[in-house]
Amino acid sequence: SFKRGKSNKVALLQLATEDKCFLFRLNKIGLTASIARFFASEKIKKIALSSKDDFAALNKRRVIAQKNVFEIQQVIGNYGIEELSLQKIYAILFGKKITKSQRLSNWEADQLDLKQQLYAATDAWATLRIYLRLLEIEEQLKRDYHLDINSTEK
């Protein structure tokens, strides 16, 4: 059973693309060689938020290389955002709240209920949306900076 403050193994791995989310029950399938290869791949960019503890816990099961991982918490301050939680960063960037009511749920349950599945998928999807929004901000800053340089040369 789940208890607040108790350290648990990473039970669930959430992966999101722009149109799909995949939930891997690590407590059921384990940390497979395929998952380890995924994290070790230089070709696949992995976007994470608050992943340090999760990677530490995963490495207790099986040492995995972490290549091409973009950790949002390491760069979010560069965008003038001091918050580090997914919910707060999302609210700042999009002006909308995402629910975190299932956070203290039992992720090792035999079956995840629909609320848990939606929470986990939303968590992964929101992380990807944050990353894509940061890229948009970066591009806008580049365009603005370029325009500013051109306007001062006239």
Language-model segment annotations:
Residues L118-K154:
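Mixed-charge, glycine-rich, non-catalytic linkers/tails in nucleic-acid processing enzymes
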